Amino acid sequence: MWTEEAAATAEARESGIRNKSSSSSQIPVVGVVTEDNEAQGVFKPMDLNRVIKLLEETDKDGLEEKQLKFVKKLVQCFQNGLPLRDLAQIFKILNLCAGKIKNQPRFVESAYDIIKLCSLPFLKKKVSDEITYAEDTANSIALLGDLMKIPSSELRIQICKCIVDFYHAEPPKKHIPGYQQASSSYKIQMAEVGGLAKTMVQSITLLEHQLVEKLWVLKVLQHLSTSEVNCTIMMKAQAASGICTHLNDPDPSGQLLFRSSEILWNLLEKSSKEEVIQQLSNLECLLALKEVFTNLFMRGFSHYDRQLRNDILVITTIIAQNPEAPMIECGFTKDLILFATFNEVKSQNLLVKGLKLSNSYEDFELKKLLFNVIVILCKDLPTVQLLIDGKVILALFTYVKKPEKQKIMGWSAAQHEELQLHAIATLSSVAPLLIEEYMSCQGNARVLAFLEWCESEDPFFSHGNSFHGTGGRGNKFAQMRYSLRLLRAMVYLEDETVNTDLCEKGTIQQMIGIFKNIISKPNEKEEAIVLEIQSDILLILSGLCENHIQRKEIFGTEGVDIVLHVMKTDPRKLQSGLGYNLLLFSTLDSIWCCILGCYPSEDYFLEREGIFLLLDVLALNQKKFCNLILGIMVEFCDNPKTAAHVNAWQGKKDQTAASLLIKLWRKEEKELGVKRDKNGKIIDTKKPLFTSFQEEHKIIPLPANCPSIAVMDVSENIRAKIYAILGKLDFENLPGLSAEDFVTLCVIHRYLDFKIGEIWNEIYEEIKLEKLRPVTIDKKALEAITTASENVGKMVASLQSEIIESQARQDVQNEQKVYAKIQATHKQRELANKSWENFLARTSNAKTLKKAKRLQEKAIEASRYHKRPQNAVFHGTDIKGLNTTVPSGGVVTVESTPARLVGGPLADTDIALKKLPIRGGALQRVKAVEIVDAPKKSIPT
């Protein structure tokens, strides 16, 4: 806020005042001359206690001269700095001198000289001195603020100069042996500890008509307010209101306004903002701010004045956030509205007659600040009439149109774009409060026409240089974004006049067209803003179509297609943080408002596997979506075609929809703290649905129009929705359920019975608490209902036990089958191992081989048919030269030496081929060979 130019201007003015003050002062300057040059860097020994004792004495001849002489010696002694160890005594001497000023004016000079010493560095002999003498130092510096009560202009100015020098520390002029300078921030810290800021704030009230001293005090407070500690102290001392009420005090230099605004800024930033706003929210402060702002607005032409004007407006905007601030009563609201609109809507008001804003940076910022303050002011409903009188809607709509080639109102293209976006954003807050004015300005038509331009291919290079222009550089996304926000705000008023007008102008078709156009041209660079635009379009469509069948029919299959497109979004993107979650919420809302209740749209949604997509999202197990999706599915289940789609769905690991819903039920009960055993079985048959919340909060009598805890539980969790869906799917024919699912399903099936019993139990308990005695018949009925509810719980628990036991038996049987299969596998492996051992024995031992051969031949012979039929052809079982110990035949495969090494299993036999190619190594088969003298034989069939 404090720019270099402003600072230079202020310092120049301050310098003039300082020179003037110095010239008018009658106090002679004491020149300290040291007699011994070698001793300049060494403190002369001085008994400070003697000086104090001397100053405390009274009624002696020549005492005043002696006292003044000793004080002068003290000043000479400490001309290069003040040791921390002596600081308490030096300030006690200063206090004694100040006490004598009223009756002995000559002590003004002594006090002045000692105060001047405070501008010198504080010196420490030990490193620990800063800590050791911290309390004495803080109390000493605090004394400077108390001395502001002395009615001496010179002393007050010197005190202020001394404090300002704390923030501009200079090294000591001479090095003092044995001493070193305290840290540069030590004085500032001690000023905070001593509470100097409080006494300086209080001193403002003593300087009502002393402009020079007041400016110096403000300069001190300006420096002090750079610290959060000091700002807190100043805030508690009511500095904000005290300074603000004097903003309009006469000051030719202009420093008063500049320094005051700087202090107010620091107080708002570095102390309790709410408390400072509360201090400024009074009629006197607001009138002062109003007068200052109006004067600067009408007569401020320099860069410095315009910047100061904007700073005052920002402070005013912050105050306006307090609904208790009398902005309307002081007339400030009316003036601000006038200043915000006079460029767009011509006014004959004398305040703005002949005024014109330039395209300078300060005036451009002013325009944006005025738009912003309108948004703040419109939150106070009494402001509405002033907004109507000021024609704010009409003024803002002058920006809602495509840019023209010539400059508009002198703004550059970049400035106009930013103001355009700011104006549309302001309309989003103001227009919903002024529906009649919005409609009289043809607001819907203007916005829709502007959206057409946003969607068109007209050449346009946006600058995107502002907060509102984020994501819109080189395109029209920013304009489209804020226009859709405006439409969304108007649609969600649920005003039938506005919504009907929108539908008659083809808004539904236009929104669908914009959406389809956006998804046809993916833009990953501006993905976040594109997602926001898509979300707003879906919300607008939801607001227009809700409870209107005809509008849902207009939404139709094209609308369903864009919904399905969003539903197919990669689930991993939901965690990206770009806005996919919001888009999915908007999509689910549009399913509820635009599709449900319109049978053609419902059927088309089902045909395009919309239920599958809903269940896919539900399977992601994200709690924020579950409630809404289940509510949609409850409504969809009224369509007779839905059940088949739900039952046909399969998730990961072949999970069915019924299994998914039951899993969600178990998860919900776990979060609610419902008591179940490890198998999911009911523990308390009297309270089978009780949550931990219901257990903690005892039943209390409630009025008849207040729902009880049991009733509220129905709407506050998803159990009722799951019960409704499974009921419509038929509890008896749910596919893909495990035993655990069936145990849970027993509870779900009886949910309504349990809930009714729970409510009757609440009624019974309330009667007891109110000490009412029902008649005998009613009492018996209540007891019968309670008993029946408990019996249902016992029956369900019994059924759950049967299911658990049956599953346990089934598990045992399955385990036995698996064990039998394992045994068979082991036995087969043993037989294979034994066969392999026999094979190894035959191939490694000739006797064993011969024995096996004999056994083979014997087995073959035993298997022969002994009565041979006539004309039968005899086939030998042996092939000569075949060295195998297994039955030979055309389909026998023997795992032995590879065929490529031995020439095949028949290479050495009598029926081997007569001509074989020699390729080196073993004999190889060939595809075509000529058989020599091969007898032709008929093959028996």
From Swiss-Prot:
Entry's localization field: Cell projection, Cilium; Cell projection, Cilium, Flagellum
Any single Pfam family the record assigns to this protein: CFA69_ARM_rpt
Stretches with biased composition (Low complexity): 1-10
Chief place where the protein resides: other
Gene3D superfamilies: Leucine-rich Repeat Variant
Function: Cilium- and flagellum-associated protein. In the olfactory epithelium, regulates the speed of activation and termination of the odor response and thus contributes to the robustness of olfactory transduction pathways. Required for sperm flagellum assembly and stability.
PANTHER family reported in the protein's UniProt record: CILIA- AND FLAGELLA-ASSOCIATED PROTEIN 69
SUPFAM superfamilies: ARM repeat (SSF48371)
Keyword terms: Cell projection, Cilium, Differentiation, Flagellum, Olfaction, Sensory transduction, Spermatogenesis
Protein's name according to its UniProt entry: Cilia- and flagella-associated protein 69
Gene Ontology BP terms: cell differentiation; olfactory behavior; positive regulation of fertilization; positive regulation of flagellated sperm motility; response to odorant; sensory perception of smell; spermatogenesis
